[in-house]
Amino acid sequence: MQVLKEEIRNRILTAAEKIFYEQDFRSAKLTDIAEEADIPVALIYTYFKNKEVLFDAVVAGVNEHFTDALEQEEALKSGSPSQRFEKGGVEYVHGLLQNHVKLVILMDKSAGTKHAGAKDRWVERLQLHIEKGAARFAHGSYDPALFHILSNNYVEGLLEIARHYKNDDWAMEMLSLMNRCYYHGVESL
């Protein structure tokens, strides 16, 4: 009996991910999700209190992948910014890209939820990360607007890879190319 319950919960989550990705939080209807999951609408409420709780479950873990990447990299005591990323952050960012649909849902489809504005929060957190790195590695001082621009561009680059995702190899190649451009620029400061 427990296997059946887990299977239904997973069907609901899979259906919700598809519907939230195709539409967004505000446009998605529980009836559409139930139809996609091939269950009655009332059954969704057995597993999830409401649509927002269901949305939370769909995007669970995405923010953590991002912050974990930054924290892993910040914990390293040596290496250039690009070396630190390769040692500490790349596996987490890879995980984000493997969950590209959830990343797009969180960033582009979350208006009306507590997750709205997630991109701005990521940009702010990455800006702090870049400022910490610049304090360690930069050869001069720079207007903080530069760090905001760099962080915004990097987050938007990740999102573009997620939005145009073809397959894992393609995503990792795009990430590698983007990082090469990014780190050559940052390491020249």
Show where each model-derived region lies.
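Short, basic, alpha-helical segments at the C-terminal edge of helix-turn-helix-like DNA-binding modules
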Residues: 5, 30, 60-66
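Hydrophobic/aromatic-rich alpha-helical bundle segments in the mid-to-C-terminal region
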Residues: 104-108, 134-182, 189
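Hydrophobic alpha-helical connector segments
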Residues: 57, 71-98
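Amphipathic alpha-helical packing segments from all-alpha helical-bundle domains
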Residues: 67, 87, 94, 113-138, ...
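Alpha-helical DNA-contacting segments of helix-turn-helix folds
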Residues: 56-62, 106, 115-118
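Amphipathic alpha-helical segments used for helix-helix packing
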Residues: 93-113, 160
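Solvent-exposed, amphipathic alpha-helical segments
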Residues: 15-22, 65-76, 102, 153, ...
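Helix-turn-helix
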Residues: 11, 15, 19-53, 57
